[in-house]
Amino acid sequence: MIIMIRKKRFLRVAGVLTAALVLGAGIFTAAGVLQEKSLNTAADGNWGLSFQEAGKPPVANASMDYLKKFDAYYAEDTDKKELFLTFDAGYENGHTAKILDTLKKHNVKATFFVVGNFIETSPDLVKRMVKEGHLVGNHTFTHPDMSEIATEEAFRQELSKLEDLYEKTTGKKMKKYYRPPQGKYSESNLKMAKEMGYHTIFWSLAYVDWYESDQPTREEALEKMVPRIHPGAIVLLHSTSVTNAQVLDELLTKWEEKGYSFKRVDQLT
């Protein structure tokens, strides 16, 4: 069976469940509608993955070669056992410090994609990320559906406002790595990000971890995240997940036992 993961809005006001389960050749959505889904290269839409073989990169709805035209990535094309651990941080609910403690214990440098609310409410955590050698990336200022933003001015404003807030908070320029909120994108978005000097970073491994009131169990997390790891994986976790905070030590250990090392996404380019 093929499994597809789609990242949706993870803020406290998160609405309808939109994670999809693939059944046979189609997708069963929360709305109960069976839809056919092509996994060929796509210029617009929601980021989607099809996991077909353990230990191998999934098939995505845009190819590595297509994305590279826009300085964008969902995985590194490599046989080396290295992975790029990333966290999306839309708000702080008490778990980020524990995640940072665990990363420090393993001497792992990760990438945190933050939004404006996170920097405004948790500046000390952002400063700690920087101090401890993590990369802080741009997840936009307000976490909108960027695929619906058609003008370059509006697109630039979402990224530039976060850049300014980050620099005001840390005294440092933000490195230009961008993750589209909810994994929603368009080809024009990719072009605009590239024109701003940004690399767009999708992911090749994730699971449904962003619902505060419906967290996966330890067993579910390990079942999803350990066997599907692959060389060059860009892993997406949410810092709002209590399960992630609790299981991260074990997860890192299991990946290390498989021979994996860890890199920041700025080592992709």
What are these regions (language model features)?
Residues 62, 95, 144-170, 184-231, ...:
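Alpha-helical scaffold elements lining the catalytic groove of polysaccharide deacetylases
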Residues 83-86, 110-114, 135-138, 176-180, ...:
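Structural recognition of the beta-strand scaffold that forms the well-ordered cores
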